């Protein structure tokens, strides 16, 4: 079933082809003109190309449109804007489309393209913090948007379990282990903070007793190498399990977890360096091994292996991306990264191109910092201590739905202030409450209709005609366009913006209109169909962002 705006676009595209216009028509809901539904700038955009007067070209387009079945009135405004008014029966097909397709409404056809998204990828050194939460929401909502737009989507979590931070983690847990045994010792300044290390320390005592109590430690190592490896392995496994559970509680399930350590254990790093050498993509200088990234747009060549034989950060990153491309057969790789990675992108693309991959396969979406505000001040406290505000604490404070909604509501590329007091208010100033109240209101109306034995009419052609009904119908019809725009621009926040638009229009409509009128049952039945449509579209949108469409408040 085609939505209305797609029909208008298709008709205009046919006319454009007839007039040898190369540009694709842009069609928008006409919010400023109560006498028309859509507007297009096709004539204005194309007049110069065709060397025609834009008003005359607009008249020609108008005459072509009026030969179609769907258009009631076409007006030319200003220098060549075309305002389009539809026949009422076409408008009303929106309700039939929505109530027939239900949870599939807004979905696009299967595209036979695979997109692989890597997101969160937190170091397994502790709990998830609010920055990880924003990354998780950005990735999971984008995943659902892309699925809705017809893509096959795979998701990845890259586990940084091989670096020096894991050595520091092992020492951190070992110190807490000694403390739990009643042994007083000073914790190195570089180790991690948080009371959740006590939980793991107690688990280690249950499993191993006090057999390690006489060992010593430095900032990065336990004195016995075998014990050090035990603490590394146990800590990574513990916190990775914890991370998976916290993500699940937050509405995020990731398909595949890859391991940096596993790449070393299976000689993938050596294979990568060998492949670069075979492709003549490396050279030695100043005792180091360099990658020729300047050949493909980087501002300088990059060191792969330093003088002391140690690897630079880019080596495992290039290796995991090479493996990911080969394993997933994805058409596009999207990485959701922190904003501090921006300068890293050109060297990654160049490194992939030197392996023979299309550099455009890699897309990077940046997630900027989120600052929590409480009582008008920045909120930094956490009952689990440490240096961050933990996801589990914020969820306990405001709830999963409120946190997901607010984090999804702003572009991830901009810094964000999240007011914890605002999201707990039960009034229209709270966007989450305002949105969820709309679905609860729909359910309330449907329950009242049941009590009054009023049934929805989904086939009306002329009973939904007041300005606010038409406005709602056009906005509901536009859901698929919002999905396409959100997917194309990798902009999940557009879904929240759309939800707010629908809710604002619906609440305004409810305030001004007697939806259930026992003295006018036919109109009530038609309006009930509109309420069902609002509920379905909002439910679909809420499902995309992973927020509950509440039945009651």
Swiss-Prot record:
GO biological process: arginyl-tRNA aminoacylation
Protein name, per record: Arginine--tRNA ligase
Top-level taxon: Bacteria
Main location: cytoplasm
Organism, as annotated: Mesoplasma florum (strain ATCC 33453 / NBRC 100688 / NCTC 11704 / L1) (Acholeplasma florum)
Gene, per the UniProt record: argS
Coiled-coil segments on the chain, per record: none
Lineage of producing organism: Bacteria, Bacillati, Mycoplasmatota, Mollicutes, Entomoplasmatales
Assembly information from the UniProt record: Monomer.
GO molecular-function term, one example from the UniProt record: ATP binding
UniProt similarity note: Belongs to the class-I aminoacyl-tRNA synthetase family.
Subcellular location: Cytoplasm
Keywords of the record: Aminoacyl-tRNA synthetase, ATP-binding, Cytoplasm, Ligase, Nucleotide-binding, Protein biosynthesis
Motif position, 'HIGH' region: 122-132
Catalysed transformations (reactions): tRNA(Arg) + L-arginine + ATP = L-arginyl-tRNA(Arg) + AMP + diphosphate
Gene Ontology cellular-component annotations: cytoplasm
EC annotation from Swiss-Prot or TrEMBL: 6.1.1.19
Pfam family, one: Arg_tRNA_synt_N
PROSITE patterns: AA_TRNA_LIGASE_I
NCBIfam families: argS
Keyword Lipid metabolism belongs to the record: no
CDD domains associated with the record: ArgRS_core
Keyword Lyase: no
């Amino acid at each position: 079933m085609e939505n209305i705006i797609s029909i208008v676009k298709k008709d205009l595209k046919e006319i454009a082809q007839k007039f040898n216009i190369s540009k694709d028509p842009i069609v928008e809901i006409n919010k400023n003109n109560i006498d028309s539904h859509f507007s297009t700038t096709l004539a204005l955009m194309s007049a110069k190309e065709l060397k025609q007067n834009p008003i005359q070209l607009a008249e020609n387009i108008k005459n072509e449109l009026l030969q179609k079945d769907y258009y009631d009135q076409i007006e030319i405004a200003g220098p060549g804007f075309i305002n389009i008014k539809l026949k009422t029966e076409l408008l009303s097909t929106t309700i039939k489309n929505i109530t027939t397709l239900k949870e599939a409404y807004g979905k696009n056809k299967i595209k036979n393209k695979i997109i692989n998204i890597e997101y969160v990828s937190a170091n397994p050194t502790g709990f998830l913090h609010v920055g990880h939460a924003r990354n998780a929401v950005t990735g999971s909502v984008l995943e659902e948007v892309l699925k809705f737009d017809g893509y096959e989507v795979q998701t990845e979590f890259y586990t940084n379990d091989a670096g020096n931070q894991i050595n520091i983690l092992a020492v951190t847990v070992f110190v807490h282990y000694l403390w739990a045994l009643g042994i007083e010792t000073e914790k190195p300044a570089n180790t991690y903070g948080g009371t959740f290390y006590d939980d793991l320390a107690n688990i280690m005592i249950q499993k191993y007793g006090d057999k390690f109590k006489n060992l010593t430690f430095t900032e990065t190592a336990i004195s016995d190498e075998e014990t050090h490896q035990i603490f590394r392995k146990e800590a990574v496994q513990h916190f990775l399990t914890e991370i998976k559970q916290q993500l699940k509680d937050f509405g995020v399930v990731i398909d595949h977890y890859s391991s940096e350590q596993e790449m070393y254990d299976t000689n993938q790093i050596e294979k990568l360096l060998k492949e670069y050498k075979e492709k003549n993509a490396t050279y030695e200088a100043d005792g180091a091994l360099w990658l020729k990234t300047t050949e493909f747009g980087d501002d300088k060549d990059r060191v792969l292996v330093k003088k002391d034989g140690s690897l630079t950060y880019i080596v495992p990153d290039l290796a995991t991306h090479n493996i990911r491309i080969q394993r997933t057969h994805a058409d596009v790789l999207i990485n959701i990264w922190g904003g501090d990675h921006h300068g890293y992108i050109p060297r990654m693309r160049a490194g992939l191109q030197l392996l023979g991959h299309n550099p455009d396969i890699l897309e990077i979406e940046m997630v900027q910092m989120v600052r929590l505000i409480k009582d008008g001040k920045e909120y930094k406290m956490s009952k689990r201590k440490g240096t961050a505000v933990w996801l589990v604490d914020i969820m306990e404070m405001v709830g999963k739905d409120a946190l997901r909604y607010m984090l999804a509501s702003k572009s991830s590329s901009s810094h964000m202030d999240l007011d914890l007091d605002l999201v707990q208010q039960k009034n229209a100033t709270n966007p989450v409450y305002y949105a969820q109240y709309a679905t609860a209101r729909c359910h309330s109306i449907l329950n009242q209709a049941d009590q009054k034995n009023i049934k929805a009419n989904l086939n009306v052609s002329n009973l939904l005609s007041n300005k606010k009904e038409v406005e709602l119908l056009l906005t509901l019809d536009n859901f698929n366009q919002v999905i396409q725009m959100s997917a194309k621009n990798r902009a999940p926040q557009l879904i929240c913006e759309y939800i707010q638009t629908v809710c604002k229009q619906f609440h305004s409509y409810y305030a001004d209109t007697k939806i259930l009128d026992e003295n006018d049952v036919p109109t009530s039945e038609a309006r009930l169909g509109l309420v069902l449509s609002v509920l379905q579209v909002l439910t679909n949108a809420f499902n995309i962002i992973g927020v509950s469409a509440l039945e009651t408040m």
